[in-house]
Amino acid sequence: TLIRGETGWIIVDCLICIETAQAALNLANENLGEKPVSAVLITHTHADHFGGSRGVLTDELLAKGDIPIIVPEGFTKYAVNEAVLAGNQMARRAMYQFGLIVPPGPSGYLDAGIGKGNARGNRSFVLPTV
C-alpha cells in the first residue's frame, strides 16, 4: 500500500520480494508522480510483508538513516525466530500450498485459489528504526 504523504511515499508492507516492490514503486512514480520514500510501515513478521524492503529502500537511503522503518514491538526477534525455527517447515509447506513444485503447463500454472501465487524473486530484510 502506498500513501501519498507530504514529503513522499509512506509504504505499508513491502510485498514479498525486491523485484515486485521496486516494480510497484516505479509504477506509482510513473503514473502518480515521482516522490521519494519517506517512511516504511511493516505490519507483521510474515515475509510477504517485509521481503521487498530492499526494493524500496536503497543502500543510500538506509545509510542516511533518516527514513523511519516502523514495525510492531518485538518484530526482529519474531521475524528471525520464525525464519530460523520454522523456516524449513514453512518452505516445505509452501511448495504444496502454492503449487511451487508443479511446473507451468500449456494451460497455465497451479495457484493458491485466493491469489495467483507468490512472486518468485529475491527477498530482503532491513532492521527497523522505530
Model regions and ranges:
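Solvent-exposed loop/turn segments at secondary-structure junctions
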Residues: 16-18, 45-48, 75-77
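Conserved beta-strand hairpin/beta-sheet module of binuclear metal-dependent hydrolase folds
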Residues: 1-35
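A short helix->loop->beta-strand "cap" motif at the edges of active sites that frequently abuts
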Residues: 35-37, 60-67
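Metal-dependent catalytic neighborhoods of phosphoester/phosphodiester hydrolases
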Residues: 50-64
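Short, solvent-exposed loop/turn and secondary-structure capping segments
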Residues: 22-23, 52-53, 79-84
